């Protein structure tokens, strides 16, 4: 009976991972203490406050994300969303796009002690607001050491 339960739990975990489609391949540590994981298929560059990720390959609409450490809290009027064991504040803005649809920009922050970890991402979509699954997964995994 324990074996069956273990197998079912393993299958459920695999289904969750496959459904999200978010995989990471390398842990990156910034001199400011920010620790993030690089998404598979993305190039990473260190910036003054964090990291920038650019989707590689010959894509029509490559995604771009930035993760940074921020000292100032986000504005209080942002929407909130559950993120892991905590909560994140966020906003999504839409601009008219080109042939690939509207451009959407996510800005989201989660508390990390007295500081904040901030993710910003942009995606183009012809089908309405994207889920930003990668950006949310990146923010959830990011931490300060």
Curated annotation (Swiss-Prot):
Residues 1-15 form the signal peptide. The keyword Cell division does not apply. Transmembrane segments: none annotated. A lipid is attached at residue 16 (S-diacylglycerol cysteine). GO terms for molecular function: metal ion binding. It comes from the Bacteria. Keywords: Calcium, Lipoprotein, Metal-binding, Palmitate, Signal. Ca(2+) binds at residue 126. The keyword Signal applies. A lipid is attached at residue 16 (N-palmitoyl cysteine). Residues 53-85 are annotated as: Disordered. It holds the Pfam family Tsi3. Immunity protein that plays a role in preventing early activation of toxin Tse3. Occupies Tse3 substrate binding site and prevents the substrate from entering. Forms a heterotetramer with Tse3 consisting of two Tse3 dimers and two Tsi3 dimers. Formation of the complex inactivates Tse3 enzymatic activity. This is Immune protein Tsi3.
């Amino acid at each position: 009976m324990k074996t069956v339960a273990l197998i079912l739990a393993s299958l459920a975990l695999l289904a969750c991972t496959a459904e999200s489609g978010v995989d990471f391949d390398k842990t990156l540590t910034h001199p400011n203490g920010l620790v993030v994981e690089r998404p598979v298929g993305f190039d990473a560059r260190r910036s003054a406050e964090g990291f920038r990720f650019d989707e590689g390959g010959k894509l029509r609409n490559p995604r771009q994300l930035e993760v940074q450490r921020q000292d100032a809290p986000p504005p209080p009027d942002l929407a909130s969303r559950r993120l892991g064991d905590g909560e994140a504040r966020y906003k999504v803005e839409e601009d008219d796009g080109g042939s690939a649809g509207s451009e959407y920009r996510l800005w989201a922050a989660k508390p990390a002690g007295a500081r904040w970890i901030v993710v910003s991402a942009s995606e183009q979509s012809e089908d309405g607001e994207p889920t930003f699954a990668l950006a949310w997964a990146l923010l959830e995994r990011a931490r300060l050491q």
